[in-house]
């Protein structure tokens, strides 16, 4: 059965506080026709309609929800893998017009999208997902970043526009859910990351140029403070294999790698031509690091020798806001940017031969471009349980959940990448 795709274009200017349009895609590759439209000449709305018409060839599932206020942050929560219900966290940015909230939403996926075995007829009867707010907790100032603690996903940390960190327990009732406040930073903060190896250990980075290391289970003062940056700290991330190692990027045009056992100076400090906004350590290869920023490029580094990048990937047309490695598939990266795009990259295709037509469409490692947003993408998140399922949030009050077509995934030619990228 082929499901007709409809309804997304009706969502754009609704005044409803929360409205979702979603569908599970059931189609054949032959249903897609390329009309050779010149994308460069299209308006934002025309680009969106073109993307909507191409959805059948690119996705298994798409859900779009219009919010009352924009969210600057989004993250899937882990699930038990036995139910089609998935949860995610996001926040509000009301610019002082209303109370801000940290929110927990649930989205009920079609069973097939969630990877659960269900009969075709029953699955088709449940093609549409539902998006609902399960919990919301009052929040002082806007929610800049929200992150769950890997050791206990009921514990969520946030950082606001004044640099204040709040710790929530989402199992508690609304009035008691904020269990502690961590005050040190003097300005806005975009860096926030729990150590995946040590329960309660949290990093924060701020516009005040400092990075703070916290133990949220022991004290309300930082364990240590790093002052090695000279300008705004844009992002902080923990290494996926080493519990003492983390990275930071800053407006001071440096990428720094730190070892928390060495308190004074970074163990590696890389000057960059322009500031990086974001960085990510590979979840599969202990020496691989990605970073990106205002020049729109994605840089790949070998941590054993960071004097020059292993490879630079081009595809975005504006500043990159987020970059993350897939938790499921080695060599897969996603990036999002102010150009309204999220791009999935396949590092195994670096250096692959291309026809001229393919080369005109982008580098061989550019696997897929998600063009469903109509304003800059603030952040995205890989679902930790379901491969190829992502959620993304944009400036224009919209959250999208989307799963890449398995036909697109399986269409990739054999891997020929430089093995050094995957060590």
From Swiss-Prot:
List all membrane-crossing ranges: none
Q: Which UniProt keywords apply?
A: Chromatin regulator, Cytoplasm, Nucleus, Repeat, WD repeat
> InterPro entries attached here?
Histone-bd_RBBP4-like_N (IPR022052), WD40/YVTN_repeat-like_dom_sf (IPR015943), WD40_repeat_CS (IPR019775), WD40_repeat_dom_sf (IPR036322), WD40_rpt (IPR001680), WD_repeat_RBAP46/RBAP48/MSI1 (IPR050459)
**Pfam families per record:** CAF1C_H4-bd (PF12265), WD40 (PF00400)
Task: Spell out the subcellular localization from the entry.
Answer: Cytoplasm; Nucleus
- Molecular functions (GO terms): histone acetyltransferase activity; histone binding
Q: Where is the region Interaction with the histone H4 N-terminus?
A: 357-361
The UniProt site entry described as Important for interaction with HAT1 is assigned to: 288
Please report the residue spans annotated as repeat (WD).
138-174, 175-224, 228-268, 271-311, 315-355, 372-412
**The keyword Cytoplasm appears for this protein:** yes
Does the UniProt entry include the keyword Magnesium? no
Source superkingdom: Eukaryota
One of its GO biological process terms is: regulation of DNA-templated transcription
Output the SUPFAM superfamilies linked to this UniProt entry.
WD40 repeat-like (SSF50978)
Question: Where is it found, in Gene Ontology cellular component terms?
Answer: chromosome, telomeric region; cytoplasm; histone acetyltransferase complex; nucleus; Rpd3L complex; Rpd3L-Expanded complex
PANTHER family associated with the record? WD40 REPEAT FAMILY (PTHR22850)
* Role: Regulatory subunit of the histone acetylase B (HAT-B) complex. The complex acetylates 'Lys-12' of histone H4 which is required for telomeric silencing.
State whether it acts alone or in a complex, and with which partners, per the record: Component of the HAT-B complex composed of at least HAT1 and HAT2. The HAT-B complex binds to histone H4 tail.
For this chain, the family text in UniProt reads:
Belongs to the WD repeat RBAP46/RBAP48/MSI1 family.
Give the protein's recorded name.
Histone acetyltransferase type B subunit 2
